[in-house]
Each structure stands twice: as structure tokens, then as C-alpha cells.
Amino acid sequence: MPLAETQMATVLSNADPQGKGRVRVRMNWQTDGMQTGWVRVMTPDGGSSSDVKSNRGFVFIPEVGDQVLLGFRHGDPARPYVMGSLFNGVTGSGGLAANHRKSLTTRSGSTVTFDDTAHTILLQTTRANKIFIDELNGTITISSAEEVNVNTKNININASENMNVNVGKNFTMQVGGDANMTVDGNARLSVGGDVDSTIIKNVNTVISGDESHTIKGKFNMDVDQNIDVCSKSKISTLSEAESNISSKANMYIKSAVRVDIAKG
């Protein structure tokens, strides 16, 4: 039996009828209409495991039209296998200057690119969805053409310095249980429109320092039950216009010392 040596070939089909990742090729010396049977493809790692029954390892099947290199098991011409694919003068552009770029690109154009000069890693689809890791600047950037969804049980975000959230339109936050926020420094809230608050139960506020309210419009307070105001010091009420106090029931003014009503 003659010994077969490595051969150049072109992939004619990768639609393996048994779904085993094999390809059909035509070797360079074969004429039109000639082709091999279904040929297995070499991979850096392939097999199965106790958890994965098939496709454990690298699954990269050559595309139709790719140039490949055939080897032959024990040199048997009837037992070829694909050793790998080869770029040619049309399909290959190399790793650019100083061979600094390594990449993996799928048929549709999704890529993973490693740049050893810029020290970056880019994972990108054809629709501008990308993950960009910049080692020199210490940044990771995630970009999406539409949405970014994170689904998990727990999420922890730890920032040793600043955290900024910028929302172009609406912002909605829903909490099924309790919500706790602790600010060690100052807290500021600026709202360009209205603020509506609905609280089903009680509100308790403890202020260790002073509290000031400045209202440039009207102030209305509607309480269904009692209002109690207690101060351990003086209470002052000043109006620059007319003041009215009215009650639909009895009114009592009581002082431990005396009550003075004066005009002045």
C-alpha cells in the first residue's frame, strides 16, 4: 500500500449528515466533481467528560471554501483527517507590525482581538456590542447597541473611590424588601419637576443638627388626626402679612406663667 503524505485541499461541505463536525474536501490534484468522504477535523482539545457528552473542547469546523491541510492516519490514503486551515494571499493579513495582534473571528464577523502593543482585549459583535479591556489604563468598558441585562441571585458592587450613574431618560428602581442607604458625607437631591412620595405606614426622622426649609410658593399641610408640636426651647412664628387662626371647635391657649397678646 502506498504511503500518503500531507495534502492541500479545499473544503466543499461541512454539513455532516451525522452531526459529528466532519467536512468533505477536494484535494488539489482532484478534478471537478471529485471529493473525499467525510473527514474528521483535528482540534487542540476534543472529546467528552462525565458532565459533557459531546463537543467538550475546541469546536472550530472549517468553513466551505477554506484551504486545509490533510494528514493521513498511518499514511493510509483511505484515512485522511484535517490537520488545520491555512490562510492564503487573499484571506490572510497577519498580525500586523511586530506581530502584535492575535484574533479569533467568526464567519459573521464577531471577533476576539488581543493587542500586545496596546495591552488590550476586545470582544465585539457586528452590531457594536463589545467588551473592551484596557490593561494600561486599568479600564473595562461594556457597550451595547440596545440593552445590558444582568440576571443573578446576588450582586455586589464595590468602588474604592467614585461611582457615577448617568441616565438619559427614566430611572426606575424596585425593591421587594427593605432599602438601606448610608452616606458618611453630605447628600444632595436636585429635582427639576415635582416630587411625589407615598408612604403606607410611619415616617421617623432623627436630625442631630438643624433643619431648614425654604419654600418660594405655598405650603399646605393636611392631617387627618392630631398635630403635636413640642419644643424644649422657644417657638417663634413670624408672618409678614395677615395671620389667621381658626377652629371649628374649642380653642385653648395655656401657659405655665402668663399669656401676652400685644400689638407692635
What label would you give each PLM region?
Residues 4-230, 234-238, 243-245:
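Structural signature for extended repeat/solenoid scaffolds and their inter-repeat hinge/linker regions
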Residues 243-263:
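Leucine-rich solenoid repeat scaffolds
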